[in-house]
C-alpha cells in the first residue's frame, strides 16, 4: 500500500489529504469518509448524505473499492431510491485505521520537505496519478501467459472461480514482464460488455463468459446501465440499449452471463 498527498492548496503547498493506493485502488479522504459513515449508519444512502455525495456516486465508490481491493470493504445491496443496507467489513475497518495513521505520518513528513523542494509535490503527484474512463476495473492475478511472435494470451483469476482472458501484443506482455503470479489491473469499458439471456450458445467467438446476478439497472430513454454481482464483492457493469434490457428482462435477481471479447480487455500494472 502506497500513500500520496492529494491536491494542492492556493498557497502552492500540498493539501492535507492522503490518497492510499493498493493495486491501483485510489482511496482518498472522500472515500475513507464514506466508509466511516457507512460504518456508523449501516446505510449507503445515509452515509452519502452525511459526506455530501449522491447515492449513485456513493454506490459507485463502494463498487470501485470492492473491485480493486483483495477483500471487500463493504457488503451491500442497492435498495433503489431508499438506498440499501450496508455493513463495513473487517477489511474496511482496517483500511480506515491505516488511512488515519498514514495520513498523520505523511503530513508530518511532507511538511518538513515542502520548504526545501524546488517544485510543487502536489503537481508531481497529479502527473503520476493514473486515471481511466473504463467503467470496469478489477485487480487480478495472472495464472497463465502464452505468447508467439505477435500476440500474447494472458489468463487471470477474477475471483469466485471465474477467469478472464486478455489478448495483447507480445511486446506489451514482455515490457510488462507478465508471468504467472503477476498482479495486474484489467480494464473493460462498459459498452464492450454484452449480456446474454438464458442458454448461451457454446459456439461463440467471445472468449470471456462471466456469470453474475443483476443487482442494479438504471434506465435512460435509449440506454440502460446494468450491474452484475460476480461474487466475492466483485461487480461488472454493462451499458446496453434499453430495448435489449427489456427484451432480456434484466431486473435485480436475474442470473445472466456477461460476454467480453479478449481483445477488449486492457491490462495495466498497479
Swiss-Prot record:
Xref: SUPFAM superfamilies: MOP-like, Winged helix' DNA-binding domain
Keyword Repeat recorded: yes
Molecular function terms from GO: DNA-binding transcription factor activity; identical protein binding; molybdenum ion binding
Sequence ranges assigned to domain Mop in this UniProt record: 131-197, 203-269
Keyword Repeat part of the UniProt annotation: yes
Signal peptide span: none
Entry keywords, A to Z: Molybdenum, Repeat, Transport
Family as reported in the entry's similarity comment: Belongs to the ModE family.
Name recorded for this polypeptide: Molybdenum-pterin-binding protein MopB
Organismal lineage: Bacteria, Pseudomonadati, Pseudomonadota, Alphaproteobacteria, Rhodobacterales
Gene behind this protein: mopB
Amino acid at each position: 500500500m502506497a500513500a500520496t498527498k492529494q491536491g494542492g492548496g492556493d498557497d502552492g503547498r500540498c493539501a492535507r489529504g492522503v490518497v492510499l493506493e493498493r493495486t491501483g485502488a485510489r482511496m482518498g479522504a472522500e472515500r475513507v469518509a464514506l466508509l466511516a459513515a457507512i460504518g456508523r449508519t449501516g446505510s449507503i444512502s445515509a452515509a452519502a448524505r452525511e459526506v455530501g455525495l449522491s447515492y449513485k456516486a456513493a454506490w459507485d465508490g463502494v463498487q470501485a473499492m470492492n473491485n480493486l481491493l483483495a477483500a471487500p470493504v463493504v457488503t451491500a445491496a442497492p435498495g433503489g431510491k431508499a438506498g440499501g443496507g450496508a455493513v463495513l467489513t473487517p477489511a474496511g475497518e482496517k483500511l480506515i485505521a491505516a488511512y488515519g495513521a498514514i495520513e498523520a505520518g505523511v503530513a508530518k513528513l511532507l511538511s518538513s520537505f515542502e520548504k526545501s523542494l524546488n517544485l510543487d509535490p502536489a503537481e508531481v503527484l497529479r502527473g503520476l496519478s493514473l486515471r481511466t474512463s473504463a467503467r470496469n476495473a478489477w485487480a487480478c492475478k495472472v495464472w497463465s501467459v502464452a505468447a508467439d511472435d505477435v500476440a500474447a494470451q494472458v489468463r487471470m483469476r477474477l475471483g469466485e472461480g471465474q477467469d478472464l482472458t486478455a489478448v495483447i501484443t507480445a511486446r506489451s506482455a514482455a515490457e510488462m514482464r507478465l508471468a504467472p503470479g503477476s498482479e495486474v489491473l484489467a480494464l473493460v469499458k462498459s459498452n464492450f460488455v454484452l449480456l446474454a439471456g438464458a442458454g448461451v450458445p457454446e459456439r461463440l467467438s467471445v472468449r470471456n463468459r462471466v456469470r453474475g446476478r443483476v443487482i442494479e439497472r438504471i434506465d435512460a430513454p435509449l440506454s440502460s446501465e446494468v450491474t452484475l454481482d460476480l461474487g466475492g464483492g466483485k461487480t461488472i457493469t454493462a451499458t446496453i440499449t434499453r430495448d435489449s434490457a427489456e427484451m432480456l428482462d434484466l431486473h435485480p435477481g436475474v442470473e445472466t452471463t456477461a460476454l467480453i471479447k479478449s481483445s477488449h480487455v486492457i491490462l495495466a500494472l498497479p
